[in-house]
Amino acid sequence: MVEQVAQDEGLAPSFSPERIKQLERETRRDSIGRAWYKFSRNHLSVIGLATVILLVLLAIFANYVTPYPRHAGAFTDFAHAKISPDAQYWFGTDEIGRDIFTRVIFGLRSSLLMAVLVLTLVVPPGVLLGLLAGYYQGTWIDTVIMRVTDIFLAVPPLILALAVASVLEPNLWNGMMAVSLMWWPWYTRLVYGLGTQLRNEYFVTAAELTGARTSHILFREILPNTVSPILTKMSLDVAWVIIIGSMLSFVGLGVQPPEPSLGTMIADGARYLPDQWWIAIFPALAIVVVVLAFNLLGDGIRDMFATEEI
C-alpha cells in the first residue's frame, strides 16, 4: 500500500530491510539460474560434471565400492596373477594377482587428493601475489614479484617438479610439494593481468577516493572480479596436476608401492605389453577419463561466467 501511494505521488518507493533482503535473495536465485542455464546449454559440460561427481564419489567411498579393498595394499595372490578381464575381475589382475579395478579406484583417490591439496596450497599465495603486483603496477613491489614469477615460469614445469622430487624422499606428500612449487606462478601471472586492468576501473577509483583501505580494495573490489577466470583455470589445472603427478609416479618419484598410483601401475604394466595389455591400459584409460571430464567441466565453467555480447 505504501509502495502504491509512493508510486502514485511520483516518489521512489521505500522498502523495509526485510523487503530488501528478499529482493537480494531473489536476485541471487536469478543469477544462479542464469549461470546454470549457460552451463547446461553445453551438454558435454554437463556430462563432464556428472563424470567428475561420479569419480569423486568413487574415490571417497573406495573402500565400499571396490570388490577387493585389500588389494590396494601389500597383497599377493600368484594363483590369480595376470588374469584377463572377466566377470570376477572386471579389469583383470596384475602380475601379483591384485584386482586392477580396485587399484585403479584407489589410485584415482591418490590423484584427486594430490590435485586438491596442490590447488589448496598454490591458489591463495598465487592470487595474493598477483593482486599485489597488479595493484602496485610500476612500483618495486610489482618488479620483485613478477621477476621472481618469471624465473619460475622460465623453467619447464615438469623439469622443475622432477628436480625437486628427486631431492626429496619419494612419496605422495613430497610429490605434492614438488608440483606446488611449480604451479603458483601461473595464478600470479593470471591475476596480475586481470589486476592491472581492474585497478583503473571506476569502482576501484571510487573506493580509493573514499579512503578505503588497501585490503578492502584488493579483496572486496578487485578479487571478486577475478573469480571466474580463477575457477576456470582451477578446473582445468586439476587435470594437469593429475598428469604431472602420474608422471612423477611413473618414474618412481611419486607415490610409492604398495600404495596404488595410476602412474606406477602404467609403468609396471608396460613391461607386459602387448600380451597382458589390461595391466597398463586400464590405468591409462582412467587418466584419460579424468582429464577429459575436468576439461569439459572447465569449458562449462568458462561459458557460465562468460559475458553476453550485445
What name fits each language-model region?
Residues 44-63, 127, 288:
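Short, strongly hydrophobic transmembrane alpha-helices
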Residues 1-50, 296-310:
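Transmembrane alpha-helical segments of polytopic membrane transport and secretion proteins
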Residues 43-53, 95-310:
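Alpha-helical transmembrane segments of integral membrane proteins
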